[in-house]
Amino acid sequence: KLFLLFDDFKPDAVINYAAQGEVRNSWKWPVEWYNTNCISVVKITEFLKDKNYLKRYISVSTPEVYGATKLNLSESHSYYPSTPYAASKLAGDLHLFTLFKKYNFPVIFTRAANVYGIHQQLYRIIPRTIIYLKSGRKIDLHGEGRSKRAFIHIRDVSYLTMKLILGGVNGEIYHLAPDDNIVEIRNVVDLICKLLNYKFENSTNLIKKNFGQDSQYSLDASKVKNLFNWKQSIS
């Protein structure tokens, strides 16, 4: 049905947001993660690679492919995936790179900081914290919430994605990340607790073990900032 829709609508741009995105669960069901994040990508792009109507394919990738690092990563950083989720996403990316090199497939890759905003999946840390607080449940913070992340609002991500559709370069990777520093997850939860008048200590379970997730990564987004003279609109 999807292929019929492609030929019916003949889109000049396709943005692939579809993915199995939960890192911890990728250890439980790696086959499903590879089927969605790699095999499905191969099937879709194998169909699209010969379509004259397609001018741009945006692959929404992930910085998890770099593994844990304290560096401010550029787009040329080497890959070191440490979870089935990251490895499955990288496998899909590498296939797309081969299509670009062989057929000049019009792919652009985006790798964003942690995205937040309206209609976010409820298992993500910000909506999950709010739901748990309101329902009287304690929030489990693996690794005691010491993992560090940067956050970018979906409006900024959407704006940059549209700019890349119109003015990006095929075969290139672009980091989408804010100007401010990365923060510990526990500090994000603590801020939400304060805004909703809850005590952090009474609302969280600090679990020492942090199974299957990178402790930290940060992205250098100067490439996209310089290309479009962009500054984040929401922080």
Regions found by a protein language model. Name each.
Residues 1-115:
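N-terminal Rossmann-like NAD(P)+-binding domain of SDR-like oxidoreductases, especially those catalyzing
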Residues 38-46, 123, 155-158, 162:
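Conserved active-site region of classical short-chain dehydrogenase/reductase
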Residues 80, 118, 150-153:
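Residues at the N-terminus of a long alpha-helix
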Residues 91, 95-99, 129, 188, ...:
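Hydrophobic alpha-helix immediately C-terminal to the catalytic Tyr-X-X-X-Lys motif of short-chain
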Residues 102-106, 122-123, 167:
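Short coil/turn segments at alpha/beta junctions that flank glycine-rich nucleotide-binding fingerprints
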Residues 122-130:
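A glycine/serine/threonine-rich, flexible loop-to-helix segment
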Residues 133-235:
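C-terminal substrate-binding subdomain of Rossmann-fold SDR/epimerase-dehydratase oxidoreductases
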